[in-house]
């Protein structure tokens, strides 16, 4: 959420004080941290933010997580008639709700509240604010909320989803729809957690366009308020407006870029153990923007004989190309 406060005196004094605060659903970049990397006897490279207790050569580097800002806001125009511009930092549609709070003697064009959809990577002039009576003082707070995706999108896949796994090996579904540990909110109720070793290739379950990503987080834990927004992930937009999220990816474990078209079965990254997590696994969920709320939707995977199945906790699964 973005919140801006402004107050003005009569226009003859041409005075306005602005206090800006950026409060996003997703946090801004974290401070730089030390990353240790080493290659074990099996040839697997590990990344950690704790110094490893090993005799193997360890490399040390500094990394700063990328900003995860979905929206930037800037002001132009004179103090007595500020114009607010909004830029979508993702490569998919972004819905923005704009509203006025604590407003006195203020008029806006267009009238607020309102919901606007910013196209991928676009910037638009959305709101102009001014005093209703220019002879009197005025004040307001401009508040915004952002939700990825186009409101009203309907999930309508043409075929079951491909399991987001490499074609060899079996993997255990540790948590499925409505899982008690963490699948208990609208955004992740219809999600699956698939246990897999760190560094396992993650494949696109459905074709689409990479909308957003994060790749520089390196730690995990169970403090939801801290770790909940610190997972590496890829968000892919589908042709029906739904979006798939592949989360808890490894440090620097994203191999696609925003705006890139990906095909079903393409490798998009490596599994990991970042963010709100108790162990290495892949979190997979399909979401839509429903009335300015991210809501997960039920889906089916393709089984070994081409049949569709609903994921269940405890089932061992294999991908089929």
Q: Locations of the language-model features?
A:
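N-terminal secretory signal peptides that target proteins for export/translocation
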Residues: 1-13
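Active-site loop architecture of trypsin-fold serine endopeptidases
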Residues: 217-226, 271-283
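Acidic, glycine-rich catalytic/binding loops that coordinate metals and/or anionic ligands
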Residues: 156-177, 203, 226-229, 254-263, ...
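Short histidine-centered loop motifs in beta-beta connectors
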Residues: 197, 203, 238-265
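Bacterial N-terminal signal peptides
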Residues: 17-27
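Surface-exposed, glycine-biased beta-strand/turn segments
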Residues: 115-230
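Short hydrophobic beta/alpha edge segments that flank linear recognition/processing sites
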Residues: 234, 263-275
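Short, cationic interaction patches enriched in Lys/Arg with P/S/T/G and frequent prolines
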Residues: 2, 29-85, 89-125, 130, ...
């Amino acid at each position: 959420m973005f919140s801006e406060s402004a107050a003005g005196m009569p226009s003859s004094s041409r005075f306005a004080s602005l206090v800006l605060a950026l409060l996003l659903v997703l946090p801004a970049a974290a401070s730089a941290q030390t990353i240790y990397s080493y290659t074990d006897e099996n040839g697997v490279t590990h990344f950690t933010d704790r110094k490893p207790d090993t005799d193997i050569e360890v490399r040390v580097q500094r990394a700063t997580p990328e900003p995860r800002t979905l929206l930037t806001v800037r002001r132009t125009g004179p103090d007595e008639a500020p114009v607010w511009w909004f830029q979508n930092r993702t490569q998919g549609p972004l819905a923005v709700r704009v509203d006025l709070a604590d407003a006195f003697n203020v008029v806006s064009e267009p009238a607020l509240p309102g919901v606007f959809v910013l196209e991928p990577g676009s910037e638009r002039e959305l709101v102009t604010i001014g005093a209703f009576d220019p002879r009197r003082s005025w004040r307001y707070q401009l508040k915004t909320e952002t939700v990825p995706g186009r409101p009203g999108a309907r999930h309508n896949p043409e075929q079951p989803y491909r399991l987001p796994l490499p074609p060899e090996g079996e993997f255990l579904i540790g948590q499925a729809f409505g899982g008690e540990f963490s699948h208990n909110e609208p955004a992740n109720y219809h999600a699956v957690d698939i246990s897999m070793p760190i560094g396992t290739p993650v494949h696109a379950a459905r074709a689409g366009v990479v909308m957003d990503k994060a790749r520089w987080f390196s730690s995990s834990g169970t403090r939801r308020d801290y770790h909940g927004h610190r997972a590496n992930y890829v968000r892919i937009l589908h042709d029906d407006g739904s979006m798939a999220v592949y989360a808890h990816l490894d440090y620097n474990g994203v191999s696609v870029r925003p705006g890139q078209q990906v095909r079903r079965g393409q490798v998009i990254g490596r599994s990991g153990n970042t963010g709100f997590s108790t162990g290495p696994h892949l979190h997979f969920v399909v979401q839509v923007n429903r009335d300015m709320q991210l809501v997960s939707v039920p889906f089916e995977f393709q089984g070994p004989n081409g049949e569709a199945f609903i994921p269940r906790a405890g089932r061992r699964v294999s991908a089929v190309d």
